[in-house]
Every structure is written in structure tokens, then in C-alpha cells.
Amino acid sequence: MSKESYELKAEARERVGKGSSRELRRNGLIPAVIYGDKQAPISIALSTNEVTKRIHAGGFMTTVGTIDVDGKKIKVLPKDYQLDPVRDFTMHVDFLRVSGNTLVNVEIPVHFENEEKSDIKIGGVLNIVRHTVEFHCPANDIPEAITVDLSGLKIGDSVHISNVKLPKNITPVIADRDFTIATIVAPAAGVEEETTEEASEE
């Protein structure tokens, strides 16, 4: 399941805008917003170091955390963050306010196992079409990843979402077709064709 929860301390922001955001960043803080759950959005400031540490720890987008805003604790799920394209530090984060029964759409990573029990062991190449899959799931019960078992797959075989054993309470956002997650191809054809395959599915 998703990684252990975390808590970040924040302060409410009264001033917003580019000038305010630049001032925050000079002081080691980043602007962020908490929205959703039929409540007014809250603009906040967070420690750049603490947020960056959480992002690099992994599982940031699939882990419910707590933000302490001037003493008020709010359960949140990160929905988006922006990185500086040059210096790779966090510039802004959007958080969704959640409760125990909140349903969310989350991109969940795909992990593969038992490659040695498939034709990959004789030279087949795993062509991954989807590295993540978007699911509907409860905010407090988000899987860390979904696992695809490659046992017995031959060159030319494909893995579709219907072949994957999914945890309880999660359903794919794409529900109108049995989309492909990966294929095993012959070595000569082992160039990833994600863009082509995805385009043909959309």
C-alpha cells in the first residue's frame, strides 16, 4: 500500500502573486494551495527543503499527508507540483483536501515481476506501453504500485489491464476498453513504441 504518511508545517499566506512567490523562495519557502472538499482554497507557504525531501523520498503523489497550517491539521493528497526547469527545485505544489471517504484519481506506477519466467529469458524485450495507470481509489487506501506478473508470457504476447490482479476498491479511469500495458517483442523489434501505441489507443 501507499507509503507511511507525513506531516508538513505551513503558514497561511495573505499575499499571493509572482512578487510574493519570489519573496517566499528567497526565504527558503515555496507557495502552495490546498483546495477541494467543497471548501475555500487556502494559500500557504511550505519549507522548500522539507517538500523537496518528500518528493525525492518517492511515493509523494500517492501518499496522504497532513499539513499543519498555523496549528490546524488538514489531510491532503498532492495533485501537482512544478519544478524549476533549470535548477530542479520545487516551485509550487497543489494539494487536494481529503477525508476518509474521498475518492480520487491517481496515477499509480506499474511494476513488473517474474521476467525470468517469460520469453524475456530467451531474448524477448519487454516493451512498456504504460509506466503508470490512472485509477479511481479511496484517498486513504492508495496502492504504492500495481504489479504485473509476466510468468508464462511468450514473444508476441500482450498484457492488458484485464490480466492484472488489482487491489480492492480501485478501478481504472479508462473503463471503455481493455487497454495494453506492455508487450513482449522479438529482439529485432525491441524499440519502445509507446507514442505509437498510445496514439492508436486514444
From Swiss-Prot:
UniProt key word Transferase: no
CDD domains named among the record's database cross-references: Ribosomal_L25_TL5_CTC (cd00495)
Gene Ontology biological-process entries: translation
Domain of life of the source: Bacteria
InterPro entries per UniProt: Rbsml_bL25/Gln-tRNA_synth_N, Ribosomal_bL25/Gln-tRNA_synth, Ribosomal_bL25_b-dom, Ribosomal_bL25_C, Ribosomal_bL25_long, Ribosomal_L25_dom, Ribosomal_uL5_bac-type
Alphabetized UniProt keyword annotations: Ribonucleoprotein, Ribosomal protein, RNA-binding, rRNA-binding
Family to which this protein belongs: Belongs to the bacterial ribosomal protein bL25 family. CTC subfamily.
NCBIfam families: bL25_bact_ctc, PRK05618.1-2, PRK05943.1
Function recorded in the entry: This is one of the proteins that binds to the 5S RNA in the ribosome where it forms part of the central protuberance.
Protein name: Large ribosomal subunit protein bL25
Organism of provenance: Agrobacterium fabrum (strain C58 / ATCC 33970) (Agrobacterium tumefaciens (strain C58))
Taxonomic lineage of the native organism: Bacteria, Pseudomonadati, Pseudomonadota, Alphaproteobacteria, Hyphomicrobiales
Gene (name only): rplY
